[in-house]
Amino acid sequence: MQTPTFYDIFKQLNNTPRPSHHEERVADFLCNFAQQYGLRYRRDAQNCVVIEKDATPGHENAEPVVILNHMDMVCVAKDGYLRDGHAFDPLSDEIRAYIETVKNPDGSESRWMKAEGTSLGADNGMGLSMALAILADDSLVHGPLEVLTTTNEEDGMSGAEALSTDFIKGRKVINLDSEAYDEITMGAAGAYLQIAHFKADWANVPDGYVFRRIVIDGGLGGHSGVDINKGRCHTNQEICRFIQNFGTDKMMVCAINGGTANASISSVAEVIVAVRPETEKALTEAVVAYNDQLRRQFATTDAGISMRGEETNACSQYLRNAGDIVCAFNELPIGMLKMRDDMPGTVMTSNNAGRIITTDSEVTISCHSRSFSNEEMRALGQGITATFKKYGAVNVELLMDTPAWVERADSPLVALTCQTFQDVLGFEPKKVAMHFVLEAAYYVQKYPGVEIASIGPLIIEPHSTSERVNLDTADNIWKVTLELLKRLA
């Protein structure tokens, strides 16, 4: 049987639908792969799979090494994209990859893999394919191996969170899920996600009022970990500031909504208000003035930001407690709150209020806090809870309390990985810690003494239909990984 390349395996993976929360088929694929090559494997209730491979003869006494990846992907398609005449179905349709050669500014060429009409799944399919290719190749030199593949990494990390403390034996973990080719990730912030619930205290809007929809949009938004220190407009924050500045004594708030995801910086927000006819002019002037202020304030970060008011359908009721809800929001610490002293350019602690939603029964506000200090993160979260309750929240729901992966400055594995990059590729990668949650946090918590180094090929715009992976960097990460395994043996 011919040994498959990791590109061969990646193609097989992309023939197996694997969106988050639907990993049964790809878990079957992994178990069948293990059986095909006569390897031991285990599968838990979350469909996480670990495949074991014995050491190369003569290296049996080496410390076991874990190669870590996740099997799920963010599967999105372009608007209106059809697959063989029907709308793309992530639960049944394969990913169709192709390779494009691009001319670089210096005249050289780069090879990129993309997908036809959908996200590619190089995050984390490329790393997983490399791990499986290592399992399939008996010519390689390595110690005892455990290839661990988790589920639902992209939408909650429930697979990693539920792992039993005896699921793996190794304490040296090579993670192939990084997306910056010239970096080694050696730490990550923890996360604390809360949802505040305010009861919607409705009252009837008196006759004779006029209704306006006030919208802030055109914000750049972004990832609330990666982009939180870039000074971008948080539209939820600005709409609440506007409401408080104008005054709920002069207008009735019928609904307030903003943001699309808890972990994203809000790029659009709106409020529906009712005002007396004699107040309409003042409201219009206030919107124009606030729009001018936003455009000046965010001219360099959010060039498309704008605020406008427009007529809208009448509402029968307004929120009597809107003033309290807005005050609660405006007391929240939002954005980058502290930078790390020991790692220039890295955010230490932040908070993002990514969504505010009005329903028939309640108004909810989400707060996604992050920090490299678990104590600081939880203290921040507790302060936010107190603020919400001070203004009448009936419940503050804690949805995530994930510990930080605090890097080990003296990690022998990280040092060896850096040296291997230098020897194989001629450069030493930058050592970084990420201001967002990574699965590694759970391994640090569950497996005392674990060391983790995360590397990977260059992946641009993951989780989108523009996702692409640089194949030249993938080839080089493959070389580094093989040499690293040899040195660990």
Language-model segments: residues:
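Acidic, glycine-rich active-site loops and adjacent beta-strand->loop/helix elements
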Residues: 71-73, 119, 148-156, 177-181, ...
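Substrate-recognition/cap regions that form aromatic- and gly/pro-loop-enriched pockets
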Residues: 348-436
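Midchain, well-structured core segments that form catalytic/ion-binding scaffolds
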Residues: 17, 96, 103, 108-118, ...
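Zn-dependent metallopeptidase/amidohydrolase metal-coordination segment
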Residues: 341, 348-350, 354-364, 368, ...
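Acidic/His- and Gly-rich active-site-bordering loop/insert found
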Residues: 2-112
